[in-house]
Amino acid sequence: MAHRSHTGTGPSQRQLRVGELIRRTLADVLNRGEIHDPELNRLSITVGEVRCSPDLKVATVHVMPLGGKDVEEAIALLSKHRGELRHHITRQMTLKYAPDLRFRPDETFDRLDETRRLFSDETVMRDIRGGGEADED
């Protein structure tokens, strides 16, 4: 059987699948309060996305506390409990290596707001309605 390698510019199907499984596992662990830290458990944290490196040894976890406040505190607390979170992932998933977890703020909502702002711009609205054609006088 021939070995097919991923040559595209984006993540492979395996990276996407493993990232989604890690995201679900972390979301469940945080939702159930399985990390025994009252400071962490008082925050309602959304795990928006997990991006895995090609070798699946590093997982970058994009998180955002509910309301968008205390982002740095949430990342610091998650980083503090990185080992325990890795342990939960290895119990739920069968991987050759337990990925190193790196926590980053989830900027999806910021990008969404910027996109909405752009679409509400008068010039863009005129282009959308007019099909992008220039006015002729």
Curated annotation (Swiss-Prot):
Keywords: Cytoplasm, Ribosome biogenesis. It comes from the Bacteria. GO terms for cellular component: cytosol. Its main location: cytoplasm. InterPro entries: KH_dom-like_a/b, RbfA, RbfA_dom_sf, Ribosome-bd_factorA_CS. The keyword rRNA-binding does not apply. SUPFAM superfamilies: Ribosome-binding factor A, RbfA. The keyword Cytoplasm applies. It is found in: Cytoplasm. It holds the Pfam family RBFA. One of its GO terms (molecular function) is ribosomal small subunit binding. One of its GO terms (biological process) is maturation of SSU-rRNA. One of several proteins that assist in the late maturation steps of the functional core of the 30S ribosomal subunit. Associates with free 30S ribosomal subunits (but not with 30S subunits that are part of 70S ribosomes or polysomes). Required for efficient processing of 16S rRNA. May interact with the 5'-terminal helix region of 16S rRNA. NCBIfam families: PRK00521.2-5, rbfA. Belongs to the RbfA family. Monomer. Binds 30S ribosomal subunits, but not 50S ribosomal subunits or 70S ribosomes. This is Ribosome-binding factor A. It comes from Cereibacter sphaeroides (strain KD131 / KCTC 12085) (Rhodobacter sphaeroides).
